[in-house]
């Protein structure tokens, strides 16, 4: 089957159409703006899969309806999913704009005095607003000379932020969320909302019963040679942690081997269900070989599966990581307990950064007073105002141990195309695999246990659905925290020490939900959250605006907030603008 091509970014150079000297004097400058924009994006941004982003430039500068239509015809044939219009001069507003209502679009009007690029920018944005097709405005802070071909830093930041978010929108469109199972333990996020995926994300939902996973395992609908490779890899790389089960629940060596084998098979089969596997076609299993075109998935697990079969912890942890027995590769997005809304937050983070995501319970707020009472030690540094214990039963990406290193040698989680095999091995070495606690998981399994290194910048996010309002996004930028070992051990043991832990300290603003750490915990909208590497809340805000998802909670600096220009017409309070604009325009793919 032919592979689906990746979305491209279309660059639209628009120009003053008056001949006999005006257009002719601007052709080279205008087209050079387009080429410079394309070069910047190609150099600085990759798709989440690691592929280089392709830009498609209109064949000619666009002065009016005819050339605009020719450009659109070219873009339609090239899978252009995002457009950036550029100009150094006055052009004819509504005659030259991109009118596709579902394609993210921005306009860069050159800030120069020789020709009024800013005037076109304002006129074109007015047309977009009047027609109900929001666009992003890009206008440099400082005046440039007409022959200055450089892209100022503030313009570059907006171009790249727009491009990252726009590509995320285009990449999700037409894909599916694979729901393996149904509602897990009454968790609302696993009540998968088809309308949300269809209307806001342009995606479909593929619902598959967990018996399909059982069938694939029992009937050997997988690559048997790959299973042997996976087992050998696990034998070489897995370090096993303590078995905290009572003696009557401990498994013998043969039983543990069977649990490991099934856990690895679950990873293989869920992956094959998501993206397909041509090896299955070679076995005559053509239908199963196709997969479900899933860009994200969720596995119910508890309790209808886990009461009798190994849990999903190992499978989910490995799929969510940037490496496995096949080496370093793009991480998958697989939500524990089929929490589709947390899965969407994971999907957003992965599409924006190319990195693995940490799925976690937002488990406990530890006040400085409570920590000192329990441990006899005081919190300090980033943790001085309190911490949030982010922990789940072992399904977080192993990258979350933060044994990868950035250019300055600091702990981080890299885009998968930058990860070395040595860094992948270091993450594995920092992970223990602990037998699942019988009281939770009667069918057994292995939970990954690691501790995230401290001082690493993270952005915690979550999507929630509010009846009568629709989806909303929560964002909390902060840092991982390293606690003294004795303190960590004592606090960790009060929850479950066989699971992975990140101690998180959000950045406080002294206002609203970020008045203090307790307020962050108290205002979080669900029991789960996602950690994405870096302080990238501004990118999430831009993406949410494109999809018409209002942001109900964030601690991003106001100067970094970048939304379509029409948002400014929806009131003077910046967050109220977001709600009113999202309500006014409705979901991007409204049905």
From Swiss-Prot:
Superkingdom classification of source: Bacteria
Pfam families: Fucose_iso_C (PF02952), Fucose_iso_N1 (PF07881), Fucose_iso_N2 (PF07882)
Main location as per UniProt: cytoplasm
Cofactors: Mn(2+)
Binding locations of Mn(2+): 337, 361, 528
Swiss-Prot/TrEMBL keywords: Carbohydrate metabolism, Cytoplasm, Fucose metabolism, Isomerase, Manganese, Metal-binding
Reactions listed under catalytic activity: L-fucose = L-fuculose
Any one GO biological process: D-arabinose catabolic process
Gene Ontology molecular-function annotations: arabinose isomerase activity; L-fucose isomerase activity; manganese ion binding
InterPro entries per record: Fuc/Ara_isomerase_C, Fuc_iso_dom3_sf, Fuc_isomerase_C, Fucose_iso_dom1_sf, Fucose_iso_N1, Fucose_isomerase, Fucose_isomerase_dom2_sf, Fucose_isomerase_N/cen_sf
Active site: 337 (proton acceptor), 361 (proton acceptor)
EC numbers, comma separated: 5.3.1.25
Subcellular location: Cytoplasm
GO cellular component, one term: cytoplasm
Pathway the protein acts in: Carbohydrate degradation; L-fucose degradation; L-lactaldehyde and glycerone phosphate from L-fucose: step 1/3
Protein family membership: Belongs to the L-fucose isomerase family.
Function: Converts the aldose L-fucose into the corresponding ketose L-fuculose.
Subunit (UniProt): Homohexamer.
Protein name: L-fucose isomerase
Source organism: Salmonella choleraesuis (strain SC-B67)
Phylogenetic classification of the source organism: Bacteria, Pseudomonadati, Pseudomonadota, Gammaproteobacteria, Enterobacterales
Gene behind this protein: fucI
């Amino acid at each position: 089957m032919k592979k689906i091509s990746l979305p491209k970014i279309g660059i639209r150079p628009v120009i003053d159409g008056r001949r006999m000297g005006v257009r002719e004097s601007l052709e080279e400058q205008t087209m050079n703006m387009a080429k410079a924009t394309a070069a910047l994006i190609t150099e600085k941004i990759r798709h989440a899969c690691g592929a280089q982003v392709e830009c498609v430039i209109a064949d000619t500068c666009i002065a009016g309806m005819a050339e605009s239509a020719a450009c659109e015809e070219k873009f339609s044939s090239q899978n252009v999913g995002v457009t950036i219009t550029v100009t150094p001069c006055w052009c004819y507003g509504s005659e030259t704009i991109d009118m596709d209502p579902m394609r993210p679009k921005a306009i860069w009007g050159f800030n120069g005095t020789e020709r009024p690029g800013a005037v076109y920018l304002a006129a074109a944005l007015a047309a977009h607003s009047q027609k109900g097709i929001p666009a992003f405005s890009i206008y440099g802070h400082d005046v440039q000379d007409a022959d200055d071909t450089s892209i100022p830093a503030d313009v570059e930041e907006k171009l790249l932020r727009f491009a990252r978010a726009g590509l995320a929108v285009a990449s999700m469109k037409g894909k599916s969320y694979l729901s393996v199972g149904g509602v897990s333990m009454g968790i609302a996020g696993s009540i998968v909302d088809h309308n949300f995926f269809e209307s806001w994300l342009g995606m479909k939902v593929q619902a598959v019963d967990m018996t399909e996973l059982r069938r694939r395992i029992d009937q050997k609908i997988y690559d048997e040679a790959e299973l042997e490779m996976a087992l050998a890899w696990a034998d070489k790389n897995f370090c096993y942690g303590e078995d905290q089960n009572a003696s009557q629940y401990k498994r013998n060596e043969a039983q543990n081997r069977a649990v490991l084998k099934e856990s690895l098979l679950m990873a293989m089969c869920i992956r094959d269900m998501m993206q397909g596997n041509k090896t299955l076609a070679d076995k005559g299993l053509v239908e199963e070989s196709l997969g479900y075109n899933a860009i994200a998935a969720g596995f119910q697990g508890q309790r209808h599966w886990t009461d009798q079969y190994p849990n999903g912890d190992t499978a989910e942890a490995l799929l969510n990581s940037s490496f496995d027995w096949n080496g370093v590769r793009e991480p998958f997005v697989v939500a524990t307990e089929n929490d589709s809304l947390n899965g969407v937050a994971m999907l957003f983070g992965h599409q924006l950064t190319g990195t693995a995501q940490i799925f976690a319970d937002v488990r406990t707020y530890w006040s400085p007073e409570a920590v000192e009472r329990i441990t006899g030690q005081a919190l300090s540094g980033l943790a001085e105002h309190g911490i949030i214990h982010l922990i789940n039963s072992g399904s977080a990406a192993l990258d979350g141990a933060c044994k990868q290193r950035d250019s300055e040698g600091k702990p981080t989680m890299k885009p998968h195309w930058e990860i070395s095999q040595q860094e992948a091995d270091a993450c594995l070495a920092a992970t223990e695999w602990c037998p699942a606690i019988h009281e939770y998981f009667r069918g057994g399994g292995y939970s990954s246990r690691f501790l995230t290194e401290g001082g690493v910048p993270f952005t915690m996010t979550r999507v929630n659905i509010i009846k009568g309002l629709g989806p909303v996004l929560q964002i909390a930028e902060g840092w991982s925290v390293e606690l003294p070992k004795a303190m960590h051990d004592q606090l960790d043991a009060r929850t479950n020490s066989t699971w992975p832990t990140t101690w998180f300290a959000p950045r406080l603003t002294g206002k609203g939900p970020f008045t203090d750490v307790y307020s962050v915990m108290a205002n979080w909208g669900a029991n789960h959250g996602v950690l994405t590497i870096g302080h990238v809340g501004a990118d999430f805000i831009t993406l949410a605006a494109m999809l018409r998802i209002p942001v109900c909670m964030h601690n991003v600096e106001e100067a970094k907030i970048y939304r379509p220009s029409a948002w400014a017409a929806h009131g003077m309070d910046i967050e109220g603008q977001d709600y009113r604009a999202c309500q006014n325009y409705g979901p991007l793919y409204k049905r």
